[in-house]
Amino acid sequence: MKALLAIDGSSESALALETSASLTWPPGTHLEVLTVLPTEAEWYGGPWDTGVAYVPRDELDDRLRIDREALLERAVARLRRPGIGVAARLVTGRAASVIVDVAEEIGADLVILGARGHGAIERAFLGSVSAEVVDQTHCSVLVARAPSARRILIGTDGSDVAMSAIAFVGGSRLFEASTARVINAVDVDPSWWMGFTPGDAAFTVDPYVSVVDEGRVRGEKLTSAAAMLLRLDGLDTSTVVHEGPADAAIVQEARTWKADLVVVGTRGNGLMKRLLLGSTARSVLHHAAASVLVARRAVKALPHTEGASSEPMDAVHA
């Protein structure tokens, strides 16, 4: 497995680091830790404001570079363990673009970053950098809002991308110390009663109950099948079926069950599946209090390699 952790010294990126440290990285993993120095256009309004009237740009660059190099060194020390390689990289540029480009360059299976960073224009619930990275990368992305991933809630609707999310959780071997729960939501399509009015004989509660019951039976089958796959991969897994829109059901269950991490596929069976990121995944990403993993494809852990060891930090300046 190849993974990219993006950090910037913010409290949110500290959660991303702690989440990364909590994962059970399989032997042979290559983990790259990245931090991005801001361009001149991004300096204004940032937390690196010194509070003095004027500081030469070169001096500010030097201060921030020293700070970020120390940040990388601490992060690599936190993540290093036998059997995995950990490297560091420092790049100057536009944060979201650099993260996407480096993920592509190293062939990352997973990108991990905080929900919000140091940018001056970060939005309230999801930062502009993390939102863009989720939209633009071709691999799975974990947006961290919690320091671990011990309790994992996984949404499924039976679609291929939902099954890829299930396969990612089990096949990656990242969550062997975790407990999982699979959720399905019965969201009744109103098209079955369109054309009727409350006065029509056909407009009764019975059809609605029947549709909900059928949906619940289907949901129980879907969640049971997914749970069986996860149990085969060694995860203690339970199931639950909710009634209502999938995004609201997932966010509610994550709160009630106290999930650390919510896992969703990029698209489901909804009408908006033509979008790069499906409506359910986007809503959960913006509104869940837990970390969110947007899974794009399954990945299998590499078999253990004899003699595998951690690599020393190799800071790359660009």
Predicted segments with their positions:
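Structural beta-alpha unit
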Residues: 12, 19-22, 38-41, 55-58, ...
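Gly/Ser-rich helix-loop-strand patches that form or flank binding pockets
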Residues: 2, 12-17, 22, 26, ...
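A generic structural signal for short
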Residues: 9, 63-64, 87-88, 118, ...
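Conserved residues at beta->alpha junctions
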Residues: 7, 90, 115, 156, ...
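Small/aliphatic-rich secondary-structure junction motif
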Residues: 1-56, 82-87, 149-209, 229, ...
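Fold-core signature of tandem repeat domains
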Residues: 71, 99, 166, 218, ...
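A short acidic, glycine-rich active-site loop
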Residues: 53-70, 203-221
